[in-house]
Amino acid sequence: MAKAELSGQRERAERLRALHRPPPILVLPNAWDVASALVFASLPGCQAIATSSAGVAVALGYPDGEAIPRDVMLEAVARIAAAVELPVTADLEAGYGPAPEDAAATADGAIAAGAVGLNLEDGSADGDGRLVEPAAHAAKIRAVREAARRRDVPLVLNARVDVYLRGVGEPQTRLEETVARATAYRTAGADCIFVPGIDDADTIAALVSAIDAPINVLATAATPPVPALERLGVARVSVGSGLFRSALAFAERSARGVLEQGSFDFAADALPYPDLARLFRRESRHQTTGKE
């Protein structure tokens, strides 16, 4: 990696890290391709871009859950990172393999692709609903941290705890289990703790109070609005595959209107073609001149 390119990547990593010190809360749209990343990056309130593992996979014809080959996922991340000047953090699921070496190789590839942050989840990649042992996931985190050190990029590592999302254990035990896992992951080198599957303010507040790390929540229709999350002390909120699924739902409704009612009403809400062209002219200039 060229010296100027490495310097720029370090700067973006530090910028992303600084955004995890609320207030204000960091609101992350999750892109699934270059077009969605360019749209999000063009908005005044967008300070960084996340990728959606589900969105990237499904858009390329794969189911979610590490069915997409690692090199294909990283190529998508590279295209997104090259298209925008904002920091990009990549959702890389469980790290593409059970061993710390697997997670380290994935992190190394993500940094080479231009990412400056990544998600690493403790849910089992085989889809059986289990979580990996905390010590095993902590070992992956340490391996990712070391891979970033070797690359000399201060990667922002967002460790995902899937206790609530996967409904692990009895409801009354989930808070304690989440805090225990989060503490282990933080000690291993995680910068932020991501707890999807929580929507009620009391649980969110309890996690913010008990975990000595910035907290990331996943937005759903039931999640408190951004100002309320900020008051609760949440550092980061991401939308996961939500915007991707919303785009698919809009496409489905639009096509249904055309095919079943012969209506073209959808066109009134479409992105104007000149705006689309402007996005890609800007992206083309960016690719030509480079980030620095």
Can you say where each PLM-predicted feature lies in the sequence?
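Extended, intrinsically disordered, low-complexity segments
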Residues: 2-5, 242-292
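Alpha/beta enzyme core
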Residues: 2-239, 246-253
